[in-house]
Amino acid sequence: CGTLCADVQADELCRQSINFNRNWKYMRGDYTGAERTDYDDSNWETVGIPHSFSIPYFMSKDFYTGYGWYRKSFELTAKDLKQQLFVEFDGVFQEAEVFVNGKKAGAHTGGYTGFYFDISSAAHVGNNVIAVRVNNIWKANVAPRAGEHVFSGGIYRNVRLVRKSPVYIDWYGTFVTTPDLAANQGKSSVVRVCTDVCNKTDKMVVFKLLTEVKDAEGQILVSVENEEKVEADSTKKLEQTTESINHLTLWHPRHPYLYRVVSSVFQGQTLIDRVETPFGFRWFEWTADKGFFLNGEHLFFRGVNVHQDQAGWGDAVTEAAMRRDILLMKEAGFDLIRGSHYPHAPAFSQACDEEGMLFWSEAPFWGIGGFRPDGYWDSSAYPVDRKDEQAFEASALQQLEEMIRIHRNHPSIVAWSMCNEAFFSAPEAMKGVRRLLKRMVDLTHQLDPSRPAAIGGAQRPLGDERIDKIGDIGGYNGDGATQRDFQNPGIPNVVSEYGSVTAERPGEYSPGWGDLQMNDGWKGTPWRSGQAIWCGFDHGSIAGSQLGK
C-alpha cells in the first residue's frame, strides 16, 4: 500500500512513512547489552539497509550462521510523540528481536515475511536508539527446515518508520476484490474493499471511511463512504462495495494497467489517515482439462523460477535490481515467475504488477533431496521429532498468513503455493506433511477465496500416497512431468520446474534428463497450464555451485 495525506484538510497527525534504511551500525556476533542506549558502537561498521551477514556474496556453499546486531539513532519531536509510532520491516532472516531505548518492542520469527511493532510507549523526545538482534540459526520447529539455497542472515529488506494518527488503517489493512468481473466477462464489475480501522485511544471513536476508485490518470470513477464507530483499543473491520464500473481496461502481461483504491479516514471534516492500494481488473481460471485462461483468453504460460539473491549482494537486493530481474525475464520471453521458494519482497510483487509478469507466490515449506539428520537446512522438510510438530506447523501457517496479507492486492499473483518438494521428509513424517498441507490449503481458502492453493513440487510420492490433489493445482518438478500418474491428472496442473542441467564436457552433445524438445507446449497436453524452467539466474546453494545453476 502506498500512503499519503494531501489535497484536503489534513490533521497534523496524518500518516507519514519515512525511509529508515540509512545510517545503521552493524557488528557480526552477539553482544551483551547492545540494546542499551549508552552502548558504545563507535567501532561498529556503518551500513545501509538492505544488508546481509553474507556480503560480499558469491557462489559458495559456506556462509556465516549466528548472530548479528544492528543499531540506529534517530530524533523525535514532541509533535511526533502525539502520533502512534511504528517500525516496519519487509524482511529479516530469520529471527529478529527489536529494542527501542533499551525496551523490547517485540520479536518476529520467519525470514521471508514482513512485520511491524508499535514503539510509541518506548519513544521519547530527542535522541532515540533502535537496536535489532538478528540470528539465522537453523531451528527444528521453524519453517523452512530445509532448502537448496543459502540462508543468509540480516535485515535484508526495507525498513520504515511510520507515524500515524491514533485512529488509522491497519498494516496492509485493505483487501480489494472485483467479484463481478468474471461473470460480466470483463466488461464491468463492482469493487469490494475490506478495510481494518484501528483505534489506539481509550475511548470509542466515530469516523467516516471514504473509499474512492481511481484510474491510472487519477480520475475518480466511483466512491462510497460510511460513518462507523470503533471501540476503544480495538479494530473495526468494514466491507464496502462500490457501484459497477464500466469500460474497464483489463490488466494483462501485454498491457499491465493499474487502478488505485484510495481509502481515507475522517474525524468530522478532518482527514486523519489515507492509504492508496494499487490493483488491477483481471480474472483467471485454472482448468483441469483445458489449461489456464486469463481474461477469458487461453494462455499457456512460459514460466521461470527465480530466487531473490544476486551476486555480491546476497539476499540484500535493491528494488531496482529486483525490477531488472523481472525485465530480463520478460525480455527473454517469459510471462510467469515462480517465486522460488518463499515469499518475495513486496517491491518484487509490485514490479510484477507494473511490468506485466504473472507471479506464483510460494510459502517457505521446502525440502531437499538426500536430507540428513536434524541440525542444518538439509534436514527432513517436516519434523522427525514429535515435540517439534506443533510449533513447526504454527510457523508455516503464520508465514503463509503473512504472505497472503502482504501480497493479496497484487493482480500479478494468480496462485498461492503451499510448498516446494515437501515430500523430501522422513517416511514417518509424511502423515504430518499431508496434515499440514491440508491445513495450509484450508487457511488459504479462508483468507483469499479469489485465488487457488497450489502444491508446488508435488511429483512424489506416486500412487495412492500422492500429495498433488490436496490443493487446487498440482505442480510437478523434474521428471514429475513425465510420470504416468501426472498425465491428465484430473486437476489443474503445471510443470513447476524443468531443465537445470548445466555442464561443460568434451565430445558431441548428448541431451540430459532435463532437456525438452521445442514445442508449442499445450498441443497434445491441453490439460497442462504451463511450465516454468529451472532457473532464471544462478543462485547461492548450500550444495555449492554444482546445484546453484
Positions of the model-derived regions?
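Aromatic-lined substrate-binding rim segments of carbohydrate-active enzymes
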Residues: 326-378, 388, 434-447
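Accessory carbohydrate-binding/adhesion or oligomerization-edge regions at the termini
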Residues: 6-57, 61, 75, 129, ...
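Substrate-binding clefts and catalytic carboxylate motifs of secreted carbohydrate-active enzymes
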Residues: 16-35, 48, 54, 151-154, ...
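Surface beta-strand/loop "capping" patches
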Residues: 166-202
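N-terminal carbohydrate-binding accessory modules
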Residues: 14-15, 22, 31, 173-176, ...
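Accessory beta-strand-rich segments of carbohydrate-active enzymes
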Residues: 18-20, 30, 65-171, 200-201, ...
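Aromatic- and acidic-residue-enriched carbohydrate-binding clefts of CAZyme catalytic domains
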Residues: 302-307, 362-391, 397-404, 408, ...
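Beta-strand-rich binding/interaction modules
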Residues: 100, 187-229, 239
